[in-house]
Amino acid sequence: STGMSNIKEIKQAVKILTSEKLPKKNLFILHCNTAYPTPYEDVNLRAINQLKRDLKLTVGYSDHTLGVEVSVAAVSLGAAVIEKHFTLNKNWKGPDQKSSLDQGEFENLVTSIRNIEKSFGSKIKKITNSEKKNIYFARKSIVAKKNIFKGEVYSYNNLTTKRPAGGLSPMLWKKFLFKKAKFNFRKNEKIR
């Protein structure tokens, strides 16, 4: 845990540990603020990226804030390990009881982190299976903004795009703009 430390001190500690033959794969650095509870404005989650970049080690987060949101955010920023204190009773005496989680909160934290991990995906932007069924409904078609008569020139004044798909894709807009209509079209009819 790196609470109450600056980057120079953290690098010195890592150097000492690795000089003692501790394999780097067994060394985890946890970004931390040692205030109980830590004010949100002092969390500085962006330091996780600095630790990863500068130390080239597995980096996590030791959370002393109230609630679970900051731990979940840390995971979304690349924290590979989360440490959060657990208590059976928040009313017990001790410096960290208020910022510790009870059983229900801890279960919520784990569920939230697992959901965030699932949401990371593959790094490739593609149409997912869950959204394929909405392609027809959510995509648009080129349609007549008003009645268009055969021979009339397509323009910004008489064409628009609307849901659903099934007609010409808006990607073809420039191909039709300023060309003559080959058919009559009623207002909101898909152009073909």
Could you describe each region identified by the protein language model?
Residues T2-R192:
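Catalytic cores and adjacent flexible loops of soluble metabolic enzymes
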